[in-house]
Amino acid sequence: MRSIWKGSIAFGLVNVPVKVYSATEDHDIKFHQVHAKDNGRIRYKRVCEVCGEVVEYRDINKAFESDDGQMVVITDEDIATLPEERSREIEVVEFIPAEQLDPLMYDKSYFLEPDSKSSKSYVLLAKTLAETDRIAIVHFSLRNKSRLAALRVKDFSKRDVMMIHTLLWPDEIRDPDFPILDKEVQIKPAELKMAGQVVESMTDDFKPDLYHDDYQEQLRELVQAKLEGGEAFSVEEQPAELDEGTEDVSDLLAKLEASVKARKGGKSDSKDDSDSESDSKESKSDSKPAKKAPAKKAAAKKSTAKKAPAKKAAAKKS
């Protein structure tokens, strides 16, 4: 496992350095979207609605829109200036009886590992929580969010491991507004007794290993059967198509280079390789938006090209 956060638990005058790890993982099968016609992969691009350009992730900022339609941009630098974001401390706010915490508030779970040469302070806090049957309510910052969390101890094969469960804030829990439940319903004693007997007949100790995700297991069997039944296929990555309508020189150059790489190593016309190389040089040297050059001008540039691919193309022609 790889830790996602480092900090220290602070309670009283004691600090417990810890590493934080995600405690759970998704076991669902992941599917790709493909075109039903030819099984080609479906790709999504982040396109700016103002200029129409495809935007790289590194060039994307966050913006907040107010109720009246006003927008303000919040950068990573802005967020880094917040005091809560800079904190690397898990602050213990209070200790509560374990039964008082409603499971509805639980969000995500994380393991805590000692992050020091000595684990004494870690073990001390873990044993204290276990023997007093208490949960620590803590406050810390994780992934650009201020978190309320529950710190508790869980026994893993005779190893006491401290865990943090992030909690939902009270205003994140919705009110179940079901008017039908406001009506009084009469339950007969015999009905209540019979229902209790059914519950007792089905009561047992909880053994999580007895339960399996039947749907995912059947889905894996289906996938394996198709793989073994000759239905598997592979789709080669297709080079980006040239967009004649774009005026973004850098984007055009990238597409031209992709086309040149796609042609190398196979049987291709050397003239096409040479033309692609000369077009790339023209795109780099011209600061204006790329335009189609007259045939004579393109031929003149090709004859003066000194790059290795151009020489190789000329040798093939001779």
Curated annotation (Swiss-Prot):
Biased composition (Basic and acidic residues): 266-289
Compositional bias per record (Basic residues), positions renumbered to this chain: 290-318
SMART domains in UniProt: Ku78
GO biological process: DNA recombination; double-strand break repair via nonhomologous end joining
Xref: Gene3D superfamilies: 2.40.290.10
Pfam families: Ku
InterPro entries from the UniProt entry: Ku70/Ku80_beta-barrel_dom, Prok_Ku, SPOC-like_C_dom_sf
Null allele phenotype: Not essential for growth in the absence of DNA damage. 500-fold less efficient for NHEJ on blunt-ended or 5'overhang DSBs, 4-fold less efficient in repair of 3'-overhang DSBs. The fidelity of DNA repair depends on the form of the DSB; for blunt-ends fidelity is very low, and no longer entails nucleotide insertion, for 5'-overhangs remains 50% faithful but with very little nucleotide insertion, for 3'-overhangs repair is fully faithful. 1000-fold decrease in viability when exposed to ionizing radiation in late and stationary phase; not exacerbated by a double ligD-ku deletion.
Statement: the UniProt record of this protein carries the keyword DNA damage: yes
GO MF terms held by the record: double-stranded DNA binding
SUPFAM superfamilies: SPOC domain-like
Keywords: DNA damage, DNA recombination, DNA repair, DNA-binding
Residue span, Ku domain: 10-193
Region (Disordered) location: 259-318
Cross-referenced PANTHER family: NON-HOMOLOGOUS END JOINING PROTEIN KU
SUBUNIT field: Homodimer. Interacts with Sir2 and probably also with LigD; may form a trimeric complex during NHEJ.
Function per UniProt: With LigD forms a non-homologous end joining (NHEJ) repair enzyme which repairs blunt-end and 5'-overhang double strand breaks (DSB) with about 50% fidelity, and DSB with non-complementary 3' ends. Plays a partial role in NHEJ on 3'-overhang repair of complementary ends. NHEJ repairs DSB with blunt ends and 5' overhangs with a high level of nucleotide insertion/deletion, without a need for microhomology. This protein but not LigD also suppresses homologous recombination. Overexpression dramatically increases the efficiency of NHEJ with no effect on repair fidelity.
HAMAP family cross-referenced by the UniProt entry: Prokaryotic_Ku
Family the entry assigns: Belongs to the prokaryotic Ku family.
Protein known as: Non-homologous end joining protein Ku
